[in-house]
Each structure stands twice: as C-alpha cells, then as structure tokens.
C-alpha cells in the first residue's frame, strides 16, 4: 500500500514522522503521540493512545517505526477524510469560532505542531487556500484544500 505513495508524499510523511518522534530515535511512543495530539487540542487517554499505536504496530513492539507510519498514512489517504473529520479539524484551527481561519490562528496551530513558519510562509498558505481573497480561510475553502491534497 505504501508503494503507491509519491516521493513527495513520502518526504512529507518523513517530516511529519520526525515531528512526532521527539527524541529522534526512529520510533513513536504513546508518550510522543500524546504530546502531538494534545498540541492539536485533543485529549486522548493512555488506552486510546495505545489502541492507536496497536492499530499500526505491525511487529508488535509497542511503538511505531517509519515503515509502519507510512502504511498508516497510505491507509488514511485511501479512505479520504470524512466531512465530519474535516469539520473537526476546521474547528481546531478556528480558535475563536468565528467560522474563519485567520493567519494568526494558522500560525498558532502550526507553531504548536513544531512547524516554525515565517510570516511569509503562513501568508502563502492562506493565499493558496483563500479562494474569495478575503485574507482568511472559510470552511468551504478549507474543505477544498483538504480534498485536494
């Protein structure tokens, strides 16, 4: 399944993997997974984290290595995000709940994820998704952006 990914996708997933793999040892533990999920505003229990890891932990060693992570991402991409998941993600970004994602909100989330973006990079992301040109991302634009990746 992971063999259907492009080199660009694999490179992106490698970057994402290293955001999760805080100590850089090549594996993601429940602790590391929990840290990332909490930075996204989720609050998973230890049992939920363990379930998530068990789901993709092919060799049963209790952690996720990069090949296992790739398999998980390839699977996730196949069953494209449901409308509900996209709405949940939108709500995470839309901190003040006004129905729009501003540059400040986008910057805040990306920084929490460990992505240190310049103002230019954040503005570029907004520009790419901002179809009506109002300088922020509404739900419809967010859905289009999520579906096109």
Curated annotation (Swiss-Prot):
Ca(2+) 2 binds at residues 57, 59, 61, 63, 68. SMART domains: EFh, efhand_Ca_insen. Keywords: Acetylation, Calcium, Metal-binding, Repeat. Ca(2+) 4 binds at residues 130, 132, 134, 136, 141. It comes from the Eukaryota. Ca(2+) 3 binds at residues 94, 96, 98, 105. Ca(2+) 1 binds at residues 21, 23, 25, 27, 32. PROSITE patterns: EF_HAND_1, EF_HAND_2. SUPFAM superfamilies: EF-hand. The modification N-acetylalanine is found at residue 2. GO terms for cellular component: myosin II complex. The keyword Cell inner membrane does not apply. Residues 8-43, 44-79, 81-116, 117-149 form the EF-hand domain. Pfam families: EF-hand_7. GO terms for molecular function: calcium ion binding. This protein has four functional calcium-binding sites. Belongs to the calmodulin family. Calmodulin mediates the control of a large number of enzymes, ion channels and other proteins by Ca(2+). Among the enzymes to be stimulated by the calmodulin-Ca(2+) complex are a number of protein kinases and phosphatases. This is Calmodulin. The lineage of its organism: Eukaryota, Sar, Stramenopiles, Oomycota, Peronosporales.
